[in-house]
Swiss-Prot record:
HAMAP family: ATP_synth_gamma_bact. It is a peripheral membrane protein. Pfam families: ATP-synt. F-type ATPases have 2 components, CF(1) - the catalytic core - and CF(0) - the membrane proton channel. CF(1) has five subunits: alpha(3), beta(3), gamma(1), delta(1), epsilon(1). CF(0) has three main subunits: a, b and c. Disulfide bonds: none annotated. Signal peptide: none annotated. It is found in: Cell inner membrane. This is ATP synthase gamma chain. Belongs to the ATPase gamma chain family. It comes from Saccharophagus degradans (strain 2-40 / ATCC 43961 / DSM 17024). GO terms for cellular component: plasma membrane; proton-transporting ATP synthase complex. One of its GO terms (molecular function) is proton-transporting ATP synthase activity, rotational mechanism. One of its GO terms (biological process) is proton motive force-driven plasma membrane ATP synthesis.
Length: 286
């Protein structure tokens, strides 16, 4: 059994770690609320952009933009959103597993896979497993900007336009609530028909310049907005997952301290009992 001094040292060390994890939990909770606000602020823009693109596409059915055309799939691309830092539980691992399963289904059909990475953790992981990374961006911070993402997104859009890839997917985390974040895979290109019944009416807007020119520009902006929204939402997921991970670490540290305190008390009791026994034995000998 360890000595009382060793146990006290262990308890002190764990208490110091517990203070750190508790502080990190509070910081993550504060950052999560701000990230949620950014996520909610971005949703109306992305939703409205989708509606406008839908109106334009429905109002001009004879015009099939390249981003709307289905073709034989020979190669697919993935834009993968991960965090730059760790200590957020299985958040990134769940996304990576989803990518591996999804891409394997294509690979089994003889389809090649290209990857665009957003976040240091994803870049590190797929470099280690031999993924074909064609673009990457990292260190975008807690307040990402669309301008930070445009370069990497453009690489994938150009690849689709040049028919180097035939489908483009966006993979990230969906924020359900503080306790639940789910990995999601969404097809970005070619764009899927909008099932919203609100878009099935017959009226249309009058656009300047003409709708076709506007659609060309809006489709690119729409893809960029979807990627940006995924990055912002992943940021909220990251802070929520980190808060839960640090709470669990703090609770586990408390359990360890309780267990070590019990061991220390038993060791101290045994030492006192032994001393009393020696005193009694010495008195009896006299």
């Amino acid at each position: 059994m360890a000595s009382g001094k060793e146990i006290r040292t262990q308890i002190g060390s764990i208490k110091n770690t517990q203070k750190i994890t508790s502080a990190m939990e509070m910081v993550a909770a504060s950052k999560m609320r701000r990230a949620q606000d950014r996520m909610e602020l971005g949703k109306p823009y992305a939703s409205r952009m989708r509606a406008v693109v839908g109106h334009l596409a429905n109002g001009n059915p004879e015009y099939k933009h390249l981003y709307l055309q289905e073709r034989e799939v020979k190669r697919v691309g993935y834009i993968i959103v991960s965090s730059d830092r760790g200590l957020c539980g299985g958040l990134n691992v769940n996304v990576f597993k989803q990518v591996i399963v999804h891409s394997k289904a294509w690979a089994d059909k003889g389809v090649g896979v290209d990857l665009c990475m957003i976040g240091a953790k994803g870049t590190s992981f797929f470099n280690s497993v031999g993924g074909n990374i064609v673009a990457s961006v990292r260190d975008i911070g807690e307040k990402p900007k669309v301008s930070d993402l445009i370069g990497s997104v453009k690489v994938m859009l150009d690849a689709f336009a040049e028919q180097k890839i035939d489908k483009l997917y966006l993979v990230g985390n969906e924020f359900v609530n503080t306790m639940t974040q789910l990995p999601s895979v969404e097809q970005l290109l070619p764009l899927q028909p909008d099932e919203d019944k609100k878009l099935q009416h017959q009226w249309d807007y009058i656009y300047e310049p003409e709708a076709r020119e506007l659609l060309d520009g809006l489709l690119v902006r729409y893809i960029e907005s979807q990627v940006y929204q995924a990055v912002v939402e992943n940021g909220a997921c990251e802070q929520a997952a980190r808060m839960i991970a640090m709470k669990n670490a703090t609770d586990n540290a408390g359990d360890l301290i309780d267990g070590l305190q019990l061991v220390y008390n038993k060791a101290r009791q045994a030492a006192i009992t032994q001393e009393l026994s020696e005193i009694v034995s010495g008195a009896a000998a006299v």
